[in-house]
Swiss-Prot record:
CDD domains reported in the protein's UniProt record: AdoMet_MTases (cd02440)
Taxonomic lineage from the root: Bacteria, Bacillati, Bacillota, Bacilli, Lactobacillales
Protein name as catalogued: Demethylmenaquinone methyltransferase
Top EC category: transferase
Keyword Methyltransferase recorded: yes
Biological pathway: Quinol/quinone metabolism; menaquinone biosynthesis; menaquinol from 1,4-dihydroxy-2-naphthoate: step 2/2
InterPro entries: SAM-dependent_MTases_sf, UbiE/COQ5_MeTrFase, UbiE/COQ5_MeTrFase_CS
Function: Methyltransferase required for the conversion of demethylmenaquinol (DMKH2) to menaquinol (MKH2).
């Protein structure tokens, strides 16, 4: 069965860009709320599953304020290199401040760009990651195809994203939580409507199983899923196998 996920996010791309410019100062707090305060633990599990090697050349898509990018740079070490790509300059400015604060300017390069149309040649990277970004792009399938294109043979993709719990009781609690989520905007001094959008894309994103099927459809092999917080989040790891 073909899993089509074009127009994942039907909000016009310019509107999404403007929204992230507005929420940038509160983005880290927002991610903490979305992950129920466990995003740091999620990242640790993510890298444990991804098994990055020292010296890898890595690309972090939708890098936002740079937390995953910085963690990735520490994994590849000084012999490796990381590019963090995001479509929003305000987010990149915040990422740059963090990177300079940790003296990682040599290891990390930031780039403003479109995850659906990557400005890189085929088979460029050992690792491509995307954290909390796939649900916000207009066409997630196109992003997965681009990831596959720029990965080297035997390269790995790692996706850290919110998901949908399958247990009915947990699912009900998850949905109830996100109905309250926009109210947190007031505590952060942010726009309530922006947080309604963020809660909607989080609550309505596809299941971990469907995302696995999409990855396999686009050519990735040995795709594994690790569920987080009883299914509220998920890690997907896949490999671009060498042609035999």
């Amino acid at each position: 069965m073909v899993i089509k996920m074009s127009l994942t996010n039907k909000v016009p791309e310019k509107d999404v860009h403007d929204l992230f410019t507005r929420v940038a100062p509160h983005y880290d707090q927002m991610n903490n709320l979305i992950s129920l305060g466990t995003q740091n633990g999620w990242r640790k599990k993510f890298f444990k599953k991804l098994k990055v090697k020292a010296g890898d050349f890595a690309l972090d898509l939708c890098c936002g304020t740079g937390d995953l990018t910085i963690a990735l740079a520490k994994q590849v070490g000084p012999s490796g290199n990381v590019i963090g790509l995001d479509f929003n300059q305000k987010m990149l400015d915040l990422a740059d401040k963090k990177i300079r604060g940790q003296n990682l300017q040599k290891e990390i390069q930031l780039k403003q760009g479109d995850a659906m149309h990557l400005p890189y040649t085929d088979q460029s990277f050992d690792i491509v990651t995307i954290g909390f970004g796939l649900r916000n792009v207009p066409d997630a399938d196109q992003v997965l195809k681009e990831i596959y294109r720029v990965l080297k043979p035997d390269g790995k993709v790692g996706i850290l994203e919110t998901s949908q719990p399958t247990n009915p009781i947990i699912k009900l609690g998850w949905e109830s939580y996100f109905k309250l989520f926009p109210n947190f905007a007031k505590l952060l001094g942010a726009n309530v409507d922006d947080y309604k959008y963020l809660s909607h894309t989080t609550a309505k994103f596809i299941s971990a199983t469907r995302l696995k099927e999409m990855l396999e459809q686009d050519g990735f092999k040995n795709v594994i899923i690790t569920k987080l917080n009883l299914g509220a989040g998920a890690i997907h790891i896949g490999i671009k196998k060498k042609m035999r």
